A protein has these predicted regions:
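Extracytoplasmic ligand-binding site segments that recognize negatively charged/polar headgroups
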Residues: 14-22, 58-197
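A ligand-binding cleft/hinge motif common to bilobed small-molecule-binding domains
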Residues: 66-73, 194, 199-218
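Conserved C-terminal helix/tail region of periplasmic/extracytoplasmic solute-binding proteins
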Residues: 292-317
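Mature extracytoplasmic/periplasmic domains
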Residues: 238-296
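Short, low-complexity disordered leader/linker segments with a strong preference
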Residues: 1-10, 317
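Early extracytoplasmic/lumenal segment of secretory-pathway proteins
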Residues: 6-70
């Protein structure tokens, strides 16, 4: 093993602009000596690459939306690891064998660049987004590839009376939305929202709070009045990883007091409730707004994803 390999861990889908992985990767290097290069894959791209590399894995750890963690387990590309603070992680937020463990969660809603609305009101509901005054203003990540896009689809589907066995309400909503000529990027579109190119983005609370409080943009976050969903993002140890000991240290770190505080300071709800300080909590919308955000059966959500993607690809684009 070269000296370089000894102090490296490869993470798939650790983009510095997303969820403040930039700060987290620097802290990992400073406190553990392990260098983790940034990586801009989305959840779907990360899983596809791991499956392609199954015979000769390159990554040590992978970060992705929970439904991709469940799929990665089915694909046999991750292995169990029960990290430090295991007992503090709620049952629904981890695989019983530690194949995937939640780090933090986000709530889906509308991230709105108020200055880019051209005088239109801030939309408050899924139905509002169908109004012609928002033509050319709405963006969402590709629901057939990016986890955040699929979460948006699940959220509108639940809000419109659908369930994991029936995505007709979501498909109908996306069909109607096409009249407003939405913009559909494949990867994180944060900068395009800040610049005003995409005035309204279907995205998580933590990105909107970051825009508002860190980048001082005139950004509002809206939890739509018909309801929405909250989902965890999870981390896994890759099966037959080239640097498994370093991979385990990285997982331990992002679940440690220090690692969890970094997520909370980036406006993410840390999986360990004790890590959310009163100072961090005051940046969030009130609990009365979050009452409209539900958790879902993430196994069912994972099971439904392929069929939804196929339906979306055939009927929407």
């Amino acid at each position: 093993m070269t000296s370089h390999a000894a102090d490296t861990a490869i993470c798939y889908n650790c983009p510095p602009e997303w969820a403040d992985w930039g700060t987290q990767l620097k802290a990992i290097a400073k406190d553990t000596g392990i260098q983790v290069p940034q990586d801009n894959k989305n959840s779907g791209q990360a899983l596809a690459q791991m499956v392609a590399e199954k015979g000769n894995p390159v990554a040590d750890v992978v970060y992705y939306g929970v439904s991709f963690g469940i799929q990665a387990d089915s694909a046999g590309v991750i292995t169990g690891y029960q990290p430090a603070h295991w007992d503090e992680i709620p049952a629904g937020m981890k695989d019983p064998d530690g194949k995937w463990v939640a780090l933090h969660s986000g709530t889906m809603g509308f991230m709105v660049n108020v200055d880019a609305l051209g005088g239109a009101p801030v939309p408050q509901s899924w139905d509002d987004l169908l109004k012609p005054e928002y033509k050319g203003m709405i963006g969402y990540l590709d629901p057939a590839s990016a986890f955040v896009g699929y979460v948006a689809a699940v959220a509108v589907n639940q809000a419109k009376g659908g369930n994991m066995q029936d995505f007709t309400p979501a498909i109908n909503w996306f069909k109607k939305l096409q009249a407003n000529q939405p913009i559909v990027p494949k990867q994180t579109a944060y900068a395009r929202l800040i610049s005003g190119e995409i005035p309204i983005l279907l995205d998580y609370d933590f990105n909107a709070y970051r825009a508002k409080y860190k980048d001082h943009a005139n950004v509002a976050f809206v939890i739509p009045k018909e309801g929405t969903v909250t989902v965890p993002y999870v981390i896994s140890l890759v099966k037959n990883a080239p640097h498994p000991a370093n991979g385990k240290k990285v997982i331990d770190y992002v679940l440690s007091d220090k690692g969890q505080a970094i997520w909370a300071n980036a406006f993410l709800r840390p999986v360990r409730p004790s890590a959310m300080s009163a100072d961090a909590k005051k940046f969030f919308l009130p609990d009365s707004d979050y009452a409209r955000a539900q958790t879902v059966d993430y196994q069912q959500m994972a099971d439904a994803q392929k069929a939804f993607s196929a339906k979306y690809l055939s009927e929407i684009r």
